[in-house]
Curated annotation (Swiss-Prot):
Bias kind Polar residues: ranges: 32-41
GO cellular component labels: 90S preribosome; nucleolus
Keywords recorded for this protein, A-Z: Coiled coil, Nucleus, Ribonucleoprotein, Ribosome biogenesis, rRNA processing
Ranges of biased composition (kind: Acidic residues): 16-25, 134-151
Annotated protein name in UniProt: rRNA biogenesis protein RRP36
Sections of the chain in a coiled coil: 82-112, 218-277
Organism: Phaeosphaeria nodorum (strain SN15 / ATCC MYA-4574 / FGSC 10173) (Glume blotch fungus)
Length: 331
């Protein structure tokens, strides 16, 4: 018997009392029956628990895991459904309130238009201001509705065609670095290489002006040769030899260039004399200039030098032909 039923018993005073004091007796006579019923219920519960335990002991762990997964999925789906219902309800309430506000504004606008069908000229400005203000309020409300709709509909607007150009705003953000006053950028000029001081001198003029450099280079080459002979360190000697070879090759290249220029100058002198005689000027191509320089070089060579140059040239040509020769096909 539960505790509440035990406490919910009625008491009344006894009729026969010899000593004038009030005694009370319990009028609830169903206590013994309720106690028996609760004992039987406890026995049934214990037997049910034992039956459930015996059944659970026979269930496999795989079935229990599947049941647990199904319950967890169902609980998560219920939570999502409740959350979605709450958000949709709140959004519907907001939209409904905004629609109601728009209806009221339109009704007020219609009422103002009907009342002011025959207005005076003085009140036209004030009514126009009111109408503009109402329109602004309506636009604001429409913007709010559009913003809510944009929140609900997150999908972007699709283009009319996949070949159509992309839509881009023409509004550009102004940079913080602005030119208030245009200042000319300073231009640095070197008078040696600038045409403002006159035309640039040609190679002959430069060679005549800086001809003393050739004497300096010749003295450096002689000094290098003396240091190579005196030095005993092999590493230092190899480095000096490389430097000497580089300087000698540069000197030879300058001499060849000077000879080439000398041949061209001789040809120009001859052409000037022929032009004075009334003949048409003839300008050599670069290939013809190279041929004349090569002929002059071979004519000024000695026999031994000429043989060496011819042998070197022959080896170069044969190696080039050997490279271009096709390889032999093998099975």
């Amino acid at each position: 018997m539960p505790l509440a039923e035990k406490l919910d018993r009625k008491l009344r005073p006894a009729d026969d009392s010899s000593d004038g004091e009030d005694y009370y007796e319990v009028t609830d006579r169903s206590s013994s029956e309720s106690i028996l019923e609760t004992a039987n219920a406890n026995k049934d519960d214990a037997s049910d628990d034992e039956r459930v335990k015996s059944q659970m002991s026979k269930v496999s762990f795989g079935a229990l895991a599947k049941a647990q997964d199904a319950l967890s999925k169902q609980q998560s789906a219920d939570r999502k459904r409740k959350r979605g219902e709450d958000t949709s309800k709140s959004q519907d309430d907001k939209l409904e309130a905004l629609r109601e506000r728009l209806r009221q504004i339109k009704a007020e606008k219609m009422a103002n238009g009907a009342a002011g069908a025959k207005p005076k000229k003085k009140s036209e400005g004030t009514k126009k201001g009111k109408v503009i203000q109402d329109e602004d309020d309506e636009d604001d409300d429409e913007e709010d509705v559009d913003s809510d709709n944009s929140d609900t509909e997150a999908a972007p607007k699709a283009r009319s065609s996949k070949h159509a150009p992309m839509v881009q705003s023409s509004k550009r953000m102004v940079s913080r670095k602005r030119k208030v006053v245009d200042v000319k950028k300073p231009v640095f000029r070197d008078p040696r290489f600038d045409n403002m001081g006159g035309a640039a001198p040609d190679d002959n003029t430069l060679g005549n002006r800086y001809s003393f450099l050739n004497d300096y280079r010749a003295s450096e080459i002689a000094e290098l040769r003396r240091t190579i002979k005196k030095s005993k360190n092999e590493g230092e000697k190899e480095r000096l030899k490389k430097q000497l070879l580089s300087m000698e090759s540069q000197q030879k290249a300058r001499e060849n260039k000077e000879k080439h220029q000398e041949v061209i100058r001789e040809h120009k002198k001859k052409e000037k004399e022929l032009v004075k005689q009334g003949k048409q000027p003839f300008f050599l191509k670069k290939s013809e200039q190279k041929k004349l320089a090569l002929i002059d070089r071979f004519q000024n060579m000695k026999s031994k030098q000429l043989d060496k140059v011819i042998e070197r040239r022959r080896k170069k040509v044969t190696s080039k032909e050997r490279r271009n020769m096709p390889e032999r096909r093998t099975a």
